[in-house]
Regions:
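Alpha-helical membrane-interface segments at transmembrane helix boundaries
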Residues: 6-13, 89-103, 133-144
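Transmembrane alpha-helix/interfacial motif
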Residues: 9-50
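Residue-level signature of catalytic and energy-coupling elements of molecular machines
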Residues: 31, 107-110, 139, 149
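Predominantly long cytosolic amphipathic alpha-helical stalk/bundle segments
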Residues: 33, 39-131, 158-189
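Short leucine-rich amphipathic alpha-helical surface patches
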Residues: 123-126, 143, 147
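Hydrophobic alpha-helical transmembrane segments of polytopic membrane proteins
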Residues: 144-158
Length: 189
């Protein structure tokens, strides 16, 4: 397996190696964002659920580390809670832009590598070695870049949707908590 990879790299052009390296970085970044955001959002959802439960049980204050805990110090206003919700939304959705960029550009980056490799193959055809035994392997190797681009784009798009759903879930819990806080403190507002 390792020999096949080394053989492929030794026959590849600079552009193909550059494209595959770029896609490898994208692939690693995709999984890094997934793992970090899923751990972060899952623990955040747990904390916000606990805070919401506490509020629903009649507590006027949030004793659990919640994003709204900072917002209920001093005067409680709807505007102040809305600002906290907006800040939470920004934190919850960070990383989604990168996943979107990776999902949308990876196939094009792979296609670019394929086109350059096929152009190189056609340029070599003019040298006289234009047999099918020479052209077919070169074109099949060129298509590896397109396959790699699609291989990177699919998980990036999938992870984008998964994280977007988790972010929606945490923001929804925070909004419900803000509603309960406003209701519990309506006499102060």
């Amino acid at each position: 397996m390792f020999d096949i990879l080394l053989s492929y790299i030794s026959r590849s052009t600079f552009i193909t190696i550059f494209v595959l390296s770029w896609l490898s970085i994208y692939f690693i970044l995709t999984f890094s964002i997934l793992i970090s955001k899923m751990i972060y959002l899952s623990s955040w959802i747990y904390r916000e659920n606990k805070a919401l439960e506490s509020l629903l049980l009649g507590s006027k204050n949030i004793n659990i580390p919640s994003i709204l805990r900072k917002c209920i110090k001093g005067n409680i206003t709807k505007e102040k809670l809305d600002v906290c919700i907006s800040m939470s939304e920004k934190n919850a959705t960070s990383g989604l832009t990168w996943l979107s960029i990776i999902a949308s550009t990876s196939p094009f980056i792979g296609l670019f590598g394929t086109v350059v490799s096929i152009l190189d193959t056609f340029a070599n055809m003019g040298s006289g070695n234009a047999g099918l035994s020479v052209i077919a392997p070169a074109i099949s190797e060129a298509l590896v870049a397109t396959g790699a681009g699609i291989f990177v784009a699919i998980p990036a798009y999938t992870f984008h949707l998964l994280i977007k759903r988790k972010a929606y879930e945490v923001i929804n819990i925070i909004k419900r908590s803000a509603d309960v806080i406003l209701f519990n403190n309506k006499d102060q507002i």
